[in-house]
């Protein structure tokens, strides 16, 4: 978005569009599979929105985004296997749950560079402890300063050093 001429910088979005594929013992007991699904036709709407944005950008003939449907624990692994050149500059986790967050953190670890940013929607959130547990297990909490916005207490990020 901030580098409209950099055709190597892409936005890759992963979603089931159908809600959580499942939960684990590290997740709250009040959530279940299929919770938090997207509204009808949201996938199509988002695709149209991204395509419109693309047409308004320089070098609009080169597609710089991709939406991938499915359980990210599987689809991210497949994406990285098919695109081994991937260097991740920014990854945002709004997965809410332990297993997919941990799976993804493990998968992207070798694709991060100094300065890469990992953003989280539910870090240190007692309602969804899975993101915090996964980050703690994969990266540890003593290696990074957790940054937060002063106007939004939920979202946070770390910078790989």
For the regions a language model picked out, list residue spans one by one:
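S-adenosylmethionine/decaboxylated-SAM
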Residues: 1-161
């Amino acid at each position: 978005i901030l580098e409209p001429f950099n055709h190597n910088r892409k936005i890759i979005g992963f979603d089931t569009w159908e809600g959580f594929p499942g939960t684990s013992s590290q997740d709250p007991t009040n959530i279940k599979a299929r919770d938090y699904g997207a509204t009808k036709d949201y996938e199509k709407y988002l695709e149209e929105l991204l395509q419109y944005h693309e047409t308004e950008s320089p070098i609009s003939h080169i597609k710089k985004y991709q939406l991938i449907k499915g359980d990210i624990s599987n689809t991210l692994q497949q994406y990285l296997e098919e695109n081994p050149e991937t260097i991740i500059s920014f990854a945002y986790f709004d997965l809410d749950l332990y297993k997919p967050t941990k799976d993804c953190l493990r998968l992207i670890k070798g694709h991060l560079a100094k300065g890469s940013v990992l953003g989280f929607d539910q870090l240190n959130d007692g309602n969804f402890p899975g993101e915090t547990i996964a980050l703690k297990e994969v990266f540890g909490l003593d290696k990074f300063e957790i940054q937060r916005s002063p106007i939004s207490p939920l979202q946070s990020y770390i910078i790989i050093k």
